[in-house]
Design a protein with these regions (language model features):
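Short glycine-centered, acidic/aromatic-flanked micro-motifs in structured strand/loop junctions
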Residues: 11-15, 50-52, 149, 187
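Active-site capping/gating regions of soluble enzymes
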Residues: 26-30, 39-178, 196
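Conserved active-site loop/cleft motifs that coordinate metal ions or position small ligands
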Residues: 146, 180-187
Length: 215
């Protein structure tokens, strides 16, 4: 009130969180508004943070998610630009390529899309164990891992990043009317990256910011 500045808290959906997908976030906010005597204050001061990595793992397109939240009067407080790691699994040797990212430090929620549908695991270690036990079922499957590889990274096939989610999100924001959300680069895995992906920290951060500025 003294400064006239609007303060908002952005809640961040994440796989295996209290709510983690587009519809779950909408149900959560509808529940808050329905129970509140002042729902307009919720809409003014409470909103969501959108992480491109999280929704790449959930396989929900940026335009679908961001449009749905907008249509339901949920404030978009912040957008976090981050990559997920993607891999096409053709055999056990591809699982071995992913083992280097099972660092034991962070949780790396993993989704597997195969011919029977999609599966979600709380950590890469769980997904790798499943892959070893059910090698035939996961043949020719697509894996997406909550592992924030640098925005500028171009891993060797069959590994790749989900940078198309960053590009689609950026394009959506450019066409969006009204106040824009706070933008943030969300890579935090510098200390646990495989050695061949590491460069000096200041150079890594500078390259990421340059990547966003030149989208």
């Amino acid at each position: 009130r003294q400064t006239g500045r609007l303060m908002q808290l952005g809640l961040e959906p994440e796989p295996f969180g209290h709510f983690h997908d587009t519809d779950g976030a909408i149900r959560f906010f509808n529940g808050l508004r329905n129970r509140s005597r002042r729902p307009e204050l919720i809409e003014r001061h409470l909103g969501l943070t959108y992480d491109t990595c999280h929704f790449a793992i959930l396989r929900e397109e940026p335009e679908f998610t961001l449009s749905a939240w907008e249509e339901n009067n949920i404030a978009l407080c912040k957008v976090q630009f981050s990559n997920a790691l993607e891999c096409r699994i053709c055999g056990v040797e591809d699982l071995e390529r992913l083992r280097q990212f099972d660092d034991g430090v962070y949780f790396h929620q993993t989704s597997i899309l195969h011919r029977e549908g999609a599966m979600l695991f709380p950590d890469l270690s769980n997904a790798l164990a499943y892959g070893r036990d059910y090698a035939e079922e996961i043949r020719d499957s697509q894996w997406r891992i909550h592992y924030h590889i640098p925005l500028y990274a171009s891993p060797e096939p069959p590994l790749k990043s989900t940078e198309e989610f960053i590009q689609k999100t950026h394009n959506f924001l450019r066409g969006r009317k009204g106040p824009q959300p706070h933008l943030e680069v969300e890579t935090y895995t510098w200390s646990v990256l495989p050695d061949h992906m590491k460069i000096p920290l200041a150079a890594q951060i500078a390259r990421e910011l340059h990547y966003i500025e030149t989208l």
